[in-house]
Amino acid sequence: MSYLKQAVADGVDGFHYDTVKHIELPGEYGSNFWNVILNNGSEFQYGEILQDDVSNDAGFGKLMSITASNYAQKIRSALKDRRISAGNLMNYQVSGVDAANLVLWVESHDNYANDDQESTWMNDSDIRLGWAMITARAKGTTLFFSRPVGDGNGTQFPGQSQIGDAGSNLYKDAIVTAGNKFHNAMVVESEYLHNPGGNEQVAMIERSTKGAVIVNLVDGDKQINSETNLADGIYTDKVSGRQFNVSNGRITGSVPSRSAVVLYDDKASQAAQVSIDGYKEADNSISKATEVTLKAKNADSTTYKLGNGQEVAYKMVIKSLLVKGLKLVNQLL
């Protein structure tokens, strides 16, 4: 524990806990681990859970963020089949856990490096498209696995890099970086998932009226003429530079072959905003202790306070336990 606290003091933001499902939960026989080890002062912590029938996702999800490994499996299946319904894309495949507490990936080191080579078949194009879909979502923290140089297409370890070398530069790809920026810009916006025109080869993730990501899973450009919630205007794709027109609730444009377009208004996304997940602003108090997530976007500084207590500064996202009967105030400075 002293090591973790020292790491935080030295600038570490958080911790990954491997194979957490094999460590007992508080309340189980002889357990005093998680309620001690998680109290280290870090900003973000998550536990790796490879889901199965006995992984107790809900139990661990009450303590920390956890990985949604079954959702990643669904994403990889969609990439292989080159189609996904909006319903399947929407379902995080985890029960009893707030989606804000999920860690999302296209693949993990286990999927790639284990003997069954569950994800090794994917190429860079597959990873780009999968990443575009998960980073466009309103909930969850996305995690990118950096493969060895020369990876994929069934080749696990091509020998072009050694232990300690930098991995693949795919994380710098235009779709990957545009997806990351979109994820941050849309942090407080609601989502609407659909297949334009009912075509499951194309997935569209809209974020309120502010932005959208459209993913074309197949070869050949896809012409889009679909309903949308986006505000009227002309949107320029952050990846290809193509333009999309939105007028009277419809969007038109062309999505490149096996690619994704990322659409949003940079200026509109730069306004400072705050929000609270798990708390209704119309309520004057919380009737019982409740975990919520505070979010801030494009703010130089933000604070929260409980009741008449002291204001506490925080960065971007923080989880807080509300004490019964106290009103929560989340504000920009």
Predicted features along the sequence, with ranges:
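Active-site-proximal helices and loops of the catalytic beta/alpha 8
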Residues: 2-269
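Low-complexity, disordered linker/stalk regions enriched in Pro/Thr/Ser/Gly
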Residues: 268-333
